[in-house]
């Protein structure tokens, strides 16, 4: 009697082509939620939707009632933005986005990991969660405040995401670059090397350098 609610907002930004929704294994019991803000690079432009099977029609009707009594409709500017986003085939856009994010994410991973920083290789999206191995700070929030003060790099503490505050985890976004300019200069499937990243995402490289120096100094 279990119903699965699967948040797949980042599914289009998976770096490998083997992503498979859980709905393909249990379609009659799965509700998929997704939207355009992540794949479209439109943070703050919130337009999402549910994919609900006919077998869960009763839940669909309840969601419709709840939505209509809560927010009625998406704001007009976001609706027009969504028309633009979905009116044409966006596969080339997605492929370029994934290519860029994979290259930049791997650069951050390869250059930040050390015996002072634990970090997993990126599998999709545009975030990493490094753990800084030090006992200088009482909380991840205190650590992030010090990183911002010492390096100018802004990170969110792991405690903001439910991790214990005494674990020195921080969420890092590697998107401080002009995505449209980057995309305009590459081809689908192009190999993105260091020189290309340095040309279009110099702030990311600078930020990683500052974080690495900081981690080695504490």
Where are these regions (language model features)?
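Conserved core segment of the aminotransferase class I/II
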Residues: 28-99, 109-112, 194, 208
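Short, solvent-exposed loop/turn elements at beta->coil junctions and helix N-caps
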Residues: 36-37, 116-117, 158-162
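PLP-dependent enzyme catalytic core of the Aspartate aminotransferase-like
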Residues: 146-155, 161-218
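Conserved glycine-rich beta-strand-loop-beta hairpin in the small C-terminal domain of fold type I
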Residues: 83, 99-109, 119-132, 166-168
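Catalytic PLP-binding core of fold-type I/II PLP enzymes
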Residues: 1-17
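Short, conserved charged micro-motifs
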Residues: 136-142, 180-183
């Amino acid at each position: 009697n279990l119903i699965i609610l699967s948040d797949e907002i980042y599914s289009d930004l998976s770096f490998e082509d083997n992503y498979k929704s859980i709905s393909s294994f249990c379609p009659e019991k799965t509700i998929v939620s997704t939207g355009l803000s992540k794949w479209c690079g439109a943070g703050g432009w919130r337009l999402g939707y549910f994919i609900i099977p006919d077998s869960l029609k009763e839940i669909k009707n309840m969601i419709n009632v709840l939505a209509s009594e809560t927010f009625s409709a998406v704001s007009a500017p976001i609706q027009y933005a969504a028309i633009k986003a979905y009116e044409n085939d966006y596969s080339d856009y997605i492929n370029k986005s994934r290519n860029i994010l994979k290259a930049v994410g791997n650069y951050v991973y390869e250059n930040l990991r050390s015996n002072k920083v634990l970090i997993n290789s990126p599998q999709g999206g545009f975030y990493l969660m490094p753990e800084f191995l030090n006992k200088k700070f009482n909380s991840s929030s205190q650590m992030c405040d010090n990183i911002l003060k010492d390096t100018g790099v802004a990170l969110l503490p792991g405690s903001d995401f439910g991790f214990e505050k005494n674990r020195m985890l921080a969420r890092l976004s590697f998107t401080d670059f002009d995505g449209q300019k980057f995309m305009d200069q590459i081809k689908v499937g192009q190999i993105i090397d260091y020189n290309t990243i340095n040309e279009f995402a110099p702030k990311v490289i600078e930020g990683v350098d500052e974080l690495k120096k900081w981690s080695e100094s504490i």
